[in-house]
């Protein structure tokens, strides 16, 4: 069913803080428990460095990993090559490779005043997404608010992975462009990334189940 398919697609996200504190061993531990892993390190460097780093990370058996789309097409193409080379060398299934567009902590004023980008934030995100698609990536990390325009302009098969998810009543924290799990589904998100609404909740398991149920509620089973 559609519901069981979504449950099978769930990942444990390992971010910078956990990976830098515990190292590659944490990947092995979580994989040994049967979970799929989204390694969220947002690689952004010169193309050769990103390619070599991606090869190392792919060899860990990661299921999803990302780079910064602002690194440019050449960097993203090298990342794609690194994934393919590692999979061929170690006989691994190809992980999902995605590009970060604009962080959900970025708003229009910050884009203009601090990053010196005068374009509309939606146009910037779409441009980065198109570059990621050209480079062979499987999708992008973006706000749920941008999912529909990305699917419409690129492809419905091009994945949108959307952080900035909060349950109703939760503190937004440092996120600027936030939506609920239900709204993310309405806007066409393929995956949602949920952190503090679960980890900082009084009952994390209950909040986790609320997020899942909200996101699944618009799927016709």
Model-derived segments and spans:
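Short, small-residue-biased leader/transition segments that mark boundaries at the very start
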Residues: 2-7, 220
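Conserved anion-binding
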Residues: 49-53, 60-135, 146, 157, ...
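A C-terminal functional module that forms or caps the active site or interfaces directly
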Residues: 143-183, 187
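Hydrophobic faces of well-ordered beta-strands that scaffold small-molecule active sites
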Residues: 12-14, 37-41, 65-67, 97-101, ...
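Glycine-rich phosphate-binding active-site loops on the catalytic face of alpha/beta enzymes
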Residues: 66-72, 181, 187-207
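C-terminal helical cap(s) of enzyme catalytic domains, especially alpha/beta-barrels
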Residues: 76-82, 199-218
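Alpha-helix-loop-beta-strand connector modules within alpha/beta enzyme cores
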Residues: 25-38, 82-93, 97, 150-167, ...
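Structural motif
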Residues: 33, 60, 135, 187-188
